[in-house]
Structures are given as C-alpha cells and as structure tokens.
C-alpha cells in the first residue's frame, strides 16, 4: 500500500512542528534569564563536561560546526563562555566562565518550569516516552 503524500503525514514536518512548539515553550520560560533553549543547552552541556572542543560539542548537539560557532558568539560576548586554543593549536577548547556557571544556576529553575509545563500539556509519562523515543532516534542516526 502506498504512503499518502498529504503534508500532515510527513514525519519531518511533524518533527519540525514539535521542535518549534517546544522551542517556543522553553524560550518563554528561559526569557527571564536572557537565554534561549539552544543557549541553555550549550551552557548546561559545558557545565556537565567542563571542557569540550567545538567539534565535540557540535557532535553532542547534532549541529553543524559552523552553526555552533554562530550560536557560541553571543554566549562569548556575554562572558559566559570562553574559547581558547587547545594545546595542539588546531582546535578550540570551550569552557564556562564563572559568570556562565552563575547563568546556568539562574536558568535551571526556569528550565524545570518549562519541563513541568510540557509534562502538564501531554502528561508526564507521555513526555518521558516522547523524549526517550527522540533520543533513541538521535542515537541511531
């Protein structure tokens, strides 16, 4: 049986619509900290890993390196992220500054509110299944 070509059956469209919805939800909650969800994700990953090369962070984020560099610029300009040449001089090591650590601390409760808001929309169990399914797809890709 042939798959219908109706736009609302497109997996990519549905995924992008969901991503936009979630981004708006998280951005709204993180706005008091002056962060977008993408910026928060970068800061949170740097806090967890302490130091990453741009290529490592891009791989974790599943982003093009050039897109990540553009995303890092405002974080560097705000003084939250520091980029220094690695010992071999061929790559950049990215770390959080002290003010970046403070910014993550300020944003975590706002992020938790966004998590709770999404769980309120779809139910906690469904939200967890949704996250786990997406994570599984990302790891398989």
Regions found by a protein language model. Name each.
Residues 49-53:
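Short capping segments at the starts of secondary-structure elements
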Residues 73-132:
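Charged, amphipathic alpha-helical coiled-coil/dimerization segments
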Residues 21, 25, 41-44, 102:
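Pre-recognition alpha-helix immediately N-terminal to the DNA-recognition helix
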Residues 44-48, 108:
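Short, locally clustered residues in the helix-turn-helix/winged-helix DNA-binding domain
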Residues 54-55, 66, 73, 92:
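Residues within helix-turn-helix
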Residues 1-33, 96, 125, 132, ...:
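N-terminal leader segment of winged-helix/HTH proteins
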Residues 58:
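The alpha-helix within a helix-turn-helix
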Residues 36-42, 100, 115:
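The N-cap/first-turn positions of alpha helices
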């Amino acid at each position: 049986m042939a798959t219908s070509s109706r736009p609302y059956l497109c997996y990519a469209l549905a995924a992008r619509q969901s991503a936009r919805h979630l981004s708006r939800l998280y951005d709204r909650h993180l706005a008091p900290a002056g962060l977008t969800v993408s910026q928060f994700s970068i800061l949170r990953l740097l806090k967890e890993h302490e130091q990453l090369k741009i290529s490592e962070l891009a791989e974790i984020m599943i982003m093009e390196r050039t897109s990540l560099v553009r995303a890092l610029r405002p974080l560097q300009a705000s003084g939250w992220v520091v980029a220094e040449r690695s010992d071999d001089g061929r790559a950049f090591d990215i770390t959080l500054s002290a003010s970046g650590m403070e910014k993550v601390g300020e944003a975590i409760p706002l992020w938790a509110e966004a998590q709770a808001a999404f769980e309120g929309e779809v139910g906690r169990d469904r939200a967890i299944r949704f996250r786990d399914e997406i994570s599984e797809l990302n790891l398989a890709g």
